[in-house]
UniProtKB/Swiss-Prot annotation:
Keywords: Ribonucleoprotein, Ribosomal protein. Coiled coil: none annotated. One of its GO terms (molecular function) is tRNA binding. Belongs to the universal ribosomal protein uS10 family. The keyword Transcription regulation does not apply. Pfam families: Ribosomal_S10. One of its GO terms (cellular component) is ribosome. The keyword Ribosomal protein applies. Signal peptide: none annotated. Involved in the binding of tRNA to the ribosomes. Part of the 30S ribosomal subunit. This is Small ribosomal subunit protein uS10.
Length: 102
């Protein structure tokens, strides 16, 4: 698989879970002999929600919530067939979203 690159983009709400998954992917790829670029921390996406505390009156009394989505990017340069097989067998945590582009 010469001159190819696998780009893996990970998203999670919990950054500790995300970093643990990134370490598993990097360790697996290095063990099979592939070169790694990253992990690159991408900007954290913050969604803020403002809702009324009361169901009826008091518009001025509000409560604020936010959801932070942490993201990482890993490039695997010149992956071998064993690298692809090892990544397919890898079992990551349930709270991590993985997008793979070849």
């Amino acid at each position: 698989m010469k001159d190819q690159k696998i780009r893996i983009r990970l998203k999670a709400y919990d950054y500790k879970l995300l970093d643990r998954s990134v370490e598993e992917i990097v360790e697996t790829a290095r063990r099979t002999g592939a070169r790694i670029a990253g992990p690159v921390p991408l900007p954290t996406e913050i969604n803020k929600y403002c809702v009324n505390r009361s169901p009826h009156v008091d518009k001025k009394s509000r409560e604020q919530f936010e959801i932070r989505t942490h993201k990482r990017l890993i490039d695997i340069i010149e992956p071998t067939q064993s690298t692809v097989d090892a990544l397919m067998k890898l079992d990551l945590s349930a709270g991590v979203d993985v997008e793979i582009k070849a």
